[in-house]
Amino acid sequence: MGNTLGLAPMGTLPRRSPRREEPLPNPGSFDELHRLCKDVFPAQMEGVKLVVNKVLSSHFQVAHTIHMSALGLPGYHLHAAYAGDWQLSPTEVFPTVVGDMDSSGSLNAQVLLLLAERLRAKAVFQTQQAKFLTWQFDGEYRGDDYTATLTLGNPDLIGESVIMVAHFLQSLTHRLVLGGELVYHRRPGEEGAILTLAGKYSAVHWVATLNVGSGGAHASYYHRANEQVQVGVEFEANTRLQDTTFSFGYHLTLPQANMVFRGLVDSNWCVGAVLEKKMPPLPVTLALGAFLNHWRNRFHCGFSITVG
């Protein structure tokens, strides 16, 4: 008897399982579209500042700040923060209560709450001594691939005035995010609305963002050259003020020296830089900054010490 070979019919060949596509990510908040680029630029410093941070527990910490400047009177700020037990990410903890009060009694306070798994709420209050300046309420819903936000600013039912801001962001692909912003304001004898469209494209080493509306345009480009060098380019145009600004920022990290350098140059002939130096094993950070505006012939320099 000869050997019998069984051949499977062509139609019964094993099929490959269909490739499952990864779900689109959440685009984040509208206010964070330009954050990567803005973090490259240095914060302006002037005068001498001493900051002492103290962690009282795993949930509560305080900070004392003393600022002396040639442009104004010396000031003192007390900063307190409370963080709850619900941590969604390394930078998001709920509930969170943050407050800052200066020596004149003015208060800035912010409360963050997680009402549901996808629903967040925020309340912001600002006072000047005994007078309320700002009260703002935000509601944000984060879906699988979109974010919707509604903000009410200074609502006054008696005076019939309010500022409403609506944001929406949608992830179209893993790299492309599109959305918009609608700002509506109303007060006696006046009301209006401004629509702004936004887009963000994220590559492996760079991010480009653009906001365009009737009020102007805001474009930014962030590029991470390597683990130490980051650059940012920002363009802002305001149609109401008829003003246009172009800025270039530079961020350099030197881990072996425990130093961080930030610099900027803009189209208003302003040049500035801030150098931060950590002093291990002491919990001390030194910062030295200088800013020169050639057009207005103004020079500002500052020095700060942060403990804790």
UniProtKB/Swiss-Prot annotation:
Subcellular location(s) per record: Mitochondrion outer membrane
Name used for this protein in its record: Mitochondrial import receptor subunit TOM40B
UniProt GO molecular function = porin activity; protein transmembrane transporter activity
Q: Which organism is it from?
A: Homo sapiens (Human)
Keywords (alphabetical) are: Ion transport, Membrane, Mitochondrion, Mitochondrion outer membrane, Porin, Protein transport, Transmembrane, Transmembrane beta strand, Transport
**Annotated region (Required for mitochondrial targeting), positions in chain:** 281-308
State the similarity comment.
Belongs to the Tom40 family.
Q: What does this protein do?
A: Potential channel-forming protein implicated in import of protein precursors into mitochondria.
